[in-house]
Design a protein with these regions (language model features):
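Short coil/turn motifs at secondary-structure junctions
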Residues: 66-68, 121, 127, 144-146
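A short coil-to-beta-strand element that immediately follows conserved catalytic motifs
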Residues: 28-38
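Non-heme Fe(II)/2-oxoglutarate
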Residues: 1-30, 48
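Hydrophobic, well-ordered secondary-structure segments
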Residues: 12-22, 100, 106-107, 128, ...
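Amphipathic alpha-helical surface "interface" segments used
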Residues: 1-5, 37-42
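Catalytic core of non-heme Fe(II) oxygenases with the double-stranded beta-helix
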Residues: 43-113, 123, 132-135, 139
């Protein structure tokens, strides 16, 4: 898409770049970044996004524009094969470092970044309001290292 070329998205893109460089800093990564691509997602009732990754990108993420109730959480999965081979019963309140999947409730104005290699998806939108009221609208993006 040409979203990154449109003036109405300039303030969002400026914030995305700030956050992308913060991610680089946190991970000890040097070098310039470019916005590889960005696109809008419109998810009506019963839509979802299967687990996937973003090859050839550095950072990926989502910015939530419209979020009706029960419209589906973003989930991030542990990519290591080992934790899938044995899933022992865990006590309640276990440390986050031991979680296999982390889920984030969408909220309007929330911006989430993650490494592009991290498997992720979106749970089913269970909001059944009529028409466009049930749409979850977000912008997704990929940053590349230049």
């Amino acid at each position: 898409t040409d979203m990154d070329k449109r003036k109405e998205y300039k303030p969002l893109i400026e914030e995305l770049f700030k956050m992308a460089y913060e991610c680089n800093k946190d991970y000890g990564i040097e070098g310039k970044l470019g916005l590889g691509n960005m696109w809008a997602n419109i998810n009506p009732t019963y839509s979802y996004n299967k687990t996937h990754t973003h090859p050839n990108s550095m950072w990926s993420g989502v910015y939530y524009i419209k979020v009706p109730k029960k419209s589906g959480k973003l989930f991030l999965e542990d990519p290591r094969p080992g934790p899938n081979t044995h899933m022992p019963r865990r006590v309640e309140g276990m440390p986050e470092a031991l979680w296999r999947v982390c889920a984030y409730e969408p909220a309007e104005g929330r911006m989430i970044f993650f490494p592009s290699w991290l498997p992720h998806g979106v749970d089913i939108n269970m909001n059944t309001e009529k028409g466009e009221k049930n749409w979850r609208i977000s912008v997704s993006y990929n940053f590349i290292q230049l």
